[in-house]
Curated annotation (Swiss-Prot):
Compartments it resides in: Cell inner membrane
GO CC term (a single one): plasma membrane
Protein's name according to its UniProt entry: UPF0283 membrane protein Meso_1416
Annotated keywords: Cell inner membrane, Cell membrane, Membrane, Transmembrane, Transmembrane helix
InterPro entries associated with the record: DUF697 (IPR021147), UPF0283 (IPR006507)
Entry membrane topology: Multi-pass membrane protein
Coiled coil: none
Organism: Chelativorans sp. (strain BNC1)
Amino acid sequence: MSEPRRPAAFRIEPAPSPSPEATREDVRKPRAIRVDEAVKITPAEIDIFDSLETEASAPPPAAAPKRRSRLGAVFVAALGMLVSLAAGLWADSLIRDLFSRADWLGWLGAALVAVAALALFAIVVREAIAVARLASVERMRRRSDDAYERDDARQARAVIADLSSLLASHPDTAAGRRQLEQLEGDVIDGRDLLRIAEKELLAPLDKRAQKLVLDAAKRVSVVTAVSPRALMDVGYVIFEAVRLLRRLSELYCGRPGFFGFLRLSRNVLAHLAVTGSMAMGDTIVQQIVGHGIAARLSARLGEGVVNGMMTARIGMAAISAIRPLSFRAVERPGIGDFLKALTQFAAKTDGKRT
């Protein structure tokens, strides 16, 4: 058995501290560098704030329809030339027959043909001017949309100049045109220029257009309530819609003419198809029933209110299709703006009848 170990003392030496020369880092000497070469900022492909703003914004407008085939236009042009040749041959034969009977009858027939030809030429020129004016308004709307998207002040000023010349005959826009002339050098933003022009030039016309739409809707509601046949209702609704389109066109861009009116009607129908007029009709009925309006009105006046609201819907589509600038600074009229006034008018009419 081993002997127990005796206690002993040991000396522990502290660890050596590092020298200041070893711990000191090498200090880099100052030097000049180029920021564009040394620093390169790469933006993120997707910005979360941009995506949130895009989701919250209004839906984009519908894309322009593709151009259709020109076969229909070629057919109409060829048919028109054939009709013109036939009319010319008929007029020549008629004048020859009149000269064979008496000279004065021949000269009278020739004079009447000349007057008819001049009148036809004047009508064609007027229709061409009306169609060109309507096409210029559509181009103006596209140019304003492009200038607003790119914030192009130069193009915005050109659009505003064309708009001022288009609306020069309207006394309601005189104050707005003077205001734009005073602010011509003060505003440098293209978007601000277009917003100011919309408020100063188109806002007074928008109020008149809404009054035209409301008056047409009131007339349709009254005629629907008193007409004995449904066919008369449909006929009057079509008549009122045609007259409303023509008046709105005269308000914004002048008299459309026959062919210009056909083109305008096609644009309005396309706008109604894009926005869903049938769904809007269901919404109108739901609003009328939901507000208890159907219970306060008679059956015929209830039908009149529905037809009047559909007429107002056509008027709203026409305003959007005819207006030279898109709705941005001015609030777009909604179906609710006409519902209250029309139902109050129908209730007052129903009270007078009872």
